[in-house]
A protein has these predicted regions:
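Short helix-terminus and kink motifs of transmembrane alpha helices
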Residues: 8, 50, 117-121
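Short helix-adjacent coil turns
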Residues: 4-5, 46, 129-130
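Catalytic cores of large soluble enzymes that bind and process phosphate-bearing ligands
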Residues: 2, 6, 52, 56, ...
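C-terminal ends of transmembrane helices
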Residues: 16-17, 42, 61-72, 118-131
Length: 160
């Protein structure tokens, strides 16, 4: 090996890598969430007339999630709040005639918040025999899904 590292150098390099987390810019995350929302709504059988409103509500809902996460620093509260506002916006968009199917609009818009990767990793950990991390990840994923479900159920209970 041409250049070997000491343990101290290796540790400092690992710390530098850990500090230098490169995320996508916030605007790109919001645009991506909007596109995913619209795509999921269409895949579930939604009409193309609902696409613009789904794109707007999906992007807006994810922006609320990101900014409330910075403000509150509680992931579950941010997911609840953004799902709550997505539900309200979807219901009012249908009532005002901007959309036609509030259920598919809501499904598409909350999909970027759904913890699909966490659920997959939890199942993978459990199948690999890593029970502590599997149960931990699974519990976090279920809490996230529960917060999303509670928010939408609360909105439906409030409006109907």
């Amino acid at each position: 090996v041409a250049s070997e590292l000491t343990l101290e150098e290796l540790y400092s390099e690992l710390q530098a890598i850990d500090r230098d987390r490169s995320f996508f810019p916030v605007w790109l995350q919001i645009v991506s969430a909007a596109v995913i929302s619209g795509t999921i709504m269409v895949l579930f059988g939604g009409k193309m007339t609902d696409l613009p409103v789904t794109l707007i509500i999906g992007g807006w809902g994810y922006a609320v999630y990101l900014y409330s996460l910075k403000f509150f620093r509680i992931k579950f509260l941010s997911e609840f709040l953004s799902s709550l506002l997505i539900g309200i916006a979807a219901i009012y968009s249908v009532r005002f005639g901007l959309g036609s199917n509030q259920d598919l609009i809501i499904i598409g818009c909350v999909m970027p918040l759904v913890p699909g990767v966490q659920i997959t990793n939890a199942i993978r950990d459990l199948l690999a025999g890593h029970y502590v991390s599997g149960v931990s990840r699974g519990t976090e994923a279920m809490m996230t899904a529960t917060m999303i479900g509670f928010a939408i159920a609360f909105i439906f209970q409030l409006f109907y």
